[in-house]
């Protein structure tokens, strides 16, 4: 007989997270973000208590899920609007990491829901739409947001599930 190899579902992990305060007169730049890719993304988030760390603890607790690290850009302070050049670099790097990832069975995207750039007022929705173009309609995209994030029509249209914090301080990850 032939033994059939059962493949583990692959879940792509991506994060693009910033809370913008439009009252902050200073633009946020690329260097304000912590950027992590590949194994570094997984190693870091396995040591912290946040959304990605919570997701990884669930994935790691079962033997049949393979997390596929893509890209993480994280700046949680209430920074100013994201400068055009910084937005273009982050979105380019993030989308390139998704394009170069192996085929996946699902996407987990960690976002804040309150990001804005000089050229895109709905960066999260835009990233989800571009991610959808890359992975296709059959791959589910699940998004986590801060409890006061702004949920846009485009975000809803491009994701299969949206989950938000229920508590502040955030202890439900």
Can you say where each PLM-predicted feature lies in the sequence?
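Short, Lys/Arg-enriched N-terminal segments with co-localized hydrophobic residues
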Residues: 1-7
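Active-site histidine-anchored catalytic micro-motif
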Residues: 12, 17-19, 79, 84-91, ...
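Gly-rich Lys/Arg/Thr-decorated short loops/hinges at beta-loop-alpha junctions or inter-strand turns
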Residues: 35-39, 70-79, 110-112
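Residues at the starts of beta-strands that form the adenosine-phosphate
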Residues: 10, 64-66, 140
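Short, compositionally biased low-complexity segments
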Residues: 24-27, 66-69, 157-159
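Low-complexity, highly charged intrinsically disordered N-terminal segments
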Residues: 56-98
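N-terminal amphipathic/basic leader segments beginning at the initiator methionine
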Residues: 8-62
